[in-house]
Amino acid sequence: MTTILSVRVQGKVVIGGDGQATFGHTVMKSNVKKVRSIYKNQVIAGFAGGTADAFTLFELFEKKLEKYQGQLQRSAIELAKDWRTDRLLRKLEALLAVADKKNSLIITGTGDVIQPENDIIAIGSGGPYAQAAAYAYALVYNTNLKASNIVKKSLQIASNICIYTNQSFTIKEIKSEK
Protein backbone atom coordinates (compact mmCIF):
# COMPACT_ATOMS: atom_id res chain seq x y z
CA MET A 1 0.00 0.00 0.00
CA THR A 2 1.06 3.56 -0.51
CA THR A 3 -0.07 7.09 -1.20
CA ILE A 4 0.30 8.77 -4.58
CA LEU A 5 -1.09 12.28 -5.11
CA SER A 6 -1.20 14.51 -8.16
CA VAL A 7 -2.23 18.17 -8.20
CA ARG A 8 -2.43 20.59 -11.14
CA VAL A 9 -2.43 24.27 -10.12
CA GLN A 10 -0.79 27.55 -11.09
CA GLY A 11 0.76 26.26 -14.31
CA LYS A 12 2.36 23.18 -12.76
CA VAL A 13 1.40 19.53 -12.44
CA VAL A 14 3.00 17.54 -9.66
CA ILE A 15 2.92 13.88 -8.68
CA GLY A 16 4.29 12.81 -5.33
CA GLY A 17 4.38 9.57 -3.42
CA ASP A 18 5.83 7.95 -0.36
CA GLY A 19 8.57 5.32 -0.39
CA GLN A 20 7.22 2.56 1.82
CA ALA A 21 6.98 -1.02 0.54
CA THR A 22 5.19 -3.49 2.77
CA PHE A 23 4.68 -7.22 2.79
CA GLY A 24 1.58 -7.90 4.82
CA HIS A 25 2.00 -5.83 7.95
CA THR A 26 5.79 -5.61 7.70
CA VAL A 27 7.75 -2.70 6.22
CA MET A 28 10.22 -4.22 3.75
CA LYS A 29 11.75 -1.03 2.35
CA SER A 30 11.31 2.65 3.12
CA ASN A 31 12.75 4.38 0.06
CA VAL A 32 11.09 2.91 -3.03
CA LYS A 33 10.85 5.45 -5.87
CA LYS A 34 7.19 5.17 -6.86
CA VAL A 35 7.14 8.39 -8.88
CA ARG A 36 9.17 8.85 -12.05
CA SER A 37 9.69 11.16 -14.98
CA ILE A 38 9.29 9.27 -18.24
CA TYR A 39 9.14 9.89 -21.99
CA LYS A 40 11.78 12.59 -22.35
CA ASN A 41 10.73 14.11 -19.00
CA GLN A 42 7.40 15.14 -20.57
CA VAL A 43 5.32 12.71 -18.50
CA ILE A 44 5.32 12.02 -14.78
CA ALA A 45 3.85 8.86 -13.32
CA GLY A 46 3.32 7.23 -9.96
CA PHE A 47 2.09 3.82 -8.91
CA ALA A 48 0.21 2.16 -6.09
CA GLY A 49 0.01 -1.59 -5.64
CA GLY A 50 2.47 -4.40 -6.09
CA THR A 51 5.95 -3.02 -6.74
CA ALA A 52 7.03 -5.64 -9.29
CA ASP A 53 3.67 -5.35 -11.04
CA ALA A 54 3.94 -1.58 -11.17
CA PHE A 55 7.47 -1.63 -12.61
CA THR A 56 6.21 -3.97 -15.34
CA LEU A 57 3.37 -1.55 -16.08
CA PHE A 58 5.76 1.43 -16.11
CA GLU A 59 7.83 -0.32 -18.79
CA LEU A 60 4.76 -1.15 -20.85
CA PHE A 61 3.42 2.39 -20.52
CA GLU A 62 6.75 3.86 -21.61
CA LYS A 63 6.66 1.63 -24.70
CA LYS A 64 3.15 2.89 -25.49
CA LEU A 65 4.32 6.49 -25.11
CA GLU A 66 7.18 5.80 -27.54
CA LYS A 67 4.84 4.08 -29.99
CA TYR A 68 2.28 6.90 -29.87
CA GLN A 69 4.85 9.73 -29.74
CA GLY A 70 4.01 10.93 -26.25
CA GLN A 71 0.23 11.07 -26.68
CA LEU A 72 -0.77 10.47 -23.07
CA GLN A 73 -4.45 9.64 -23.54
CA ARG A 74 -3.89 7.30 -26.47
CA SER A 75 -1.03 5.54 -24.69
CA ALA A 76 -3.12 5.16 -21.53
CA ILE A 77 -6.08 3.73 -23.42
CA GLU A 78 -3.89 1.27 -25.33
CA LEU A 79 -2.18 0.15 -22.10
CA ALA A 80 -5.56 -0.27 -20.40
CA LYS A 81 -6.82 -2.38 -23.33
CA ASP A 82 -3.78 -4.64 -23.14
CA TRP A 83 -3.97 -4.81 -19.36
CA ARG A 84 -7.63 -5.83 -19.49
CA THR A 85 -7.35 -8.39 -22.27
CA ASP A 86 -3.94 -10.04 -21.81
CA ARG A 87 -4.07 -13.09 -19.53
CA LEU A 88 -0.77 -12.40 -17.81
CA LEU A 89 -1.23 -8.65 -17.50
CA ARG A 90 -4.68 -9.13 -15.98
CA LYS A 91 -3.01 -10.61 -12.91
CA LEU A 92 -0.95 -7.48 -12.26
CA GLU A 93 -2.23 -5.55 -9.26
CA ALA A 94 -1.39 -1.87 -9.47
CA LEU A 95 -2.80 1.53 -10.36
CA LEU A 96 -0.98 4.22 -12.30
CA ALA A 97 -1.40 7.97 -11.93
CA VAL A 98 0.05 9.72 -15.00
CA ALA A 99 0.22 13.33 -16.15
CA ASP A 100 1.61 15.49 -18.92
CA LYS A 101 1.29 19.21 -19.58
CA LYS A 102 -2.37 18.84 -20.63
CA ASN A 103 -3.93 15.84 -18.88
CA SER A 104 -3.92 13.86 -15.65
CA LEU A 105 -5.18 10.27 -15.72
CA ILE A 106 -5.64 7.18 -13.57
CA ILE A 107 -5.08 3.86 -15.35
CA THR A 108 -6.55 0.75 -13.72
CA GLY A 109 -6.16 -2.96 -14.29
CA THR A 110 -9.84 -3.27 -15.11
CA GLY A 111 -9.28 -1.23 -18.25
CA ASP A 112 -10.48 2.09 -16.90
CA VAL A 113 -8.79 5.34 -17.85
CA ILE A 114 -10.16 8.04 -15.58
CA GLN A 115 -9.68 11.78 -15.92
CA PRO A 116 -10.22 13.24 -12.44
CA GLU A 117 -12.40 16.16 -11.49
CA ASN A 118 -10.55 19.27 -10.37
CA ASP A 119 -7.20 17.86 -11.60
CA ILE A 120 -6.49 16.08 -8.30
CA ILE A 121 -5.58 12.37 -8.34
CA ALA A 122 -5.08 10.25 -5.26
CA ILE A 123 -4.46 6.50 -5.28
CA GLY A 124 -3.33 3.95 -2.73
CA SER A 125 -4.26 3.30 0.87
CA GLY A 126 -3.53 6.86 1.98
CA GLY A 127 -5.08 8.36 -1.14
CA PRO A 128 -8.35 9.53 0.44
CA TYR A 129 -6.49 11.36 3.22
CA ALA A 130 -4.09 13.06 0.82
CA GLN A 131 -6.93 13.93 -1.55
CA ALA A 132 -8.97 15.52 1.24
CA ALA A 133 -5.96 17.55 2.34
CA ALA A 134 -5.19 18.64 -1.23
CA TYR A 135 -8.80 19.73 -1.75
CA ALA A 136 -8.63 21.71 1.46
CA TYR A 137 -5.39 23.45 0.48
CA ALA A 138 -6.33 24.04 -3.17
CA LEU A 139 -10.05 24.71 -2.96
CA VAL A 140 -11.24 25.51 0.54
CA TYR A 141 -8.36 27.69 1.64
CA ASN A 142 -7.72 28.97 -1.89
CA THR A 143 -4.07 28.99 -0.96
CA ASN A 144 -1.15 30.49 -2.79
CA LEU A 145 0.93 27.39 -2.06
CA LYS A 146 2.84 25.98 -5.00
CA ALA A 147 1.59 22.67 -6.40
CA SER A 148 4.65 20.87 -5.02
CA ASN A 149 3.98 22.26 -1.53
CA ILE A 150 0.33 21.21 -1.68
CA VAL A 151 1.45 17.68 -2.59
CA LYS A 152 4.11 17.56 0.12
CA LYS A 153 1.83 18.87 2.89
CA SER A 154 -1.00 16.57 1.81
CA LEU A 155 1.31 13.54 1.77
CA GLN A 156 2.53 14.49 5.25
CA ILE A 157 -1.06 14.49 6.50
CA ALA A 158 -1.71 11.10 4.86
CA SER A 159 1.47 9.65 6.37
CA ASN A 160 0.32 10.71 9.83
CA ILE A 161 -2.92 8.76 9.38
CA CYS A 162 -2.17 5.80 7.07
CA ILE A 163 0.16 3.13 8.49
CA TYR A 164 1.14 2.07 4.96
CA THR A 165 2.51 5.52 4.08
CA ASN A 166 5.83 6.95 5.25
CA GLN A 167 7.49 10.37 4.92
CA SER A 168 10.16 9.40 2.40
CA PHE A 169 8.62 11.35 -0.47
CA THR A 170 9.49 11.52 -4.15
CA ILE A 171 7.93 14.54 -5.85
CA LYS A 172 8.15 15.29 -9.59
CA GLU A 173 6.90 18.41 -11.36
CA ILE A 174 6.39 19.55 -14.95
CA LYS A 175 4.84 22.65 -16.51
CA SER A 176 1.13 22.54 -17.22
CA GLU A 177 -0.89 24.25 -19.93
CA LYS A 178 -3.89 24.52 -17.62
Swiss-Prot record:
Protein name, entry field: ATP-dependent protease subunit HslV
Keywords for this protein: Allosteric enzyme, Cytoplasm, Hydrolase, Metal-binding, Protease, Sodium, Threonine protease
InterPro entries: ATP-dep_Prtase_HsIV_su, Ntn_hydrolases_N, Proteasome_sua/b, Proteasome_suB-type
Pfam families for the chain: Proteasome
Main location: cytoplasm
Cross-referenced SUPFAM superfamilies: N-terminal nucleophile aminohydrolases (Ntn hydrolases) (SSF56235)
Compartments where located: Cytoplasm
Top-level EC class: hydrolase
Gene Ontology annotations of biological process type: proteolysis involved in protein catabolic process
Enzyme Commission number(s) of this protein: 3.4.25.2
GO terms for MF: metal ion binding; threonine-type endopeptidase activity
Catalytic activity of the protein: ATP-dependent cleavage of peptide bonds with broad specificity
Family matches, as CDD domains: protease_HslV
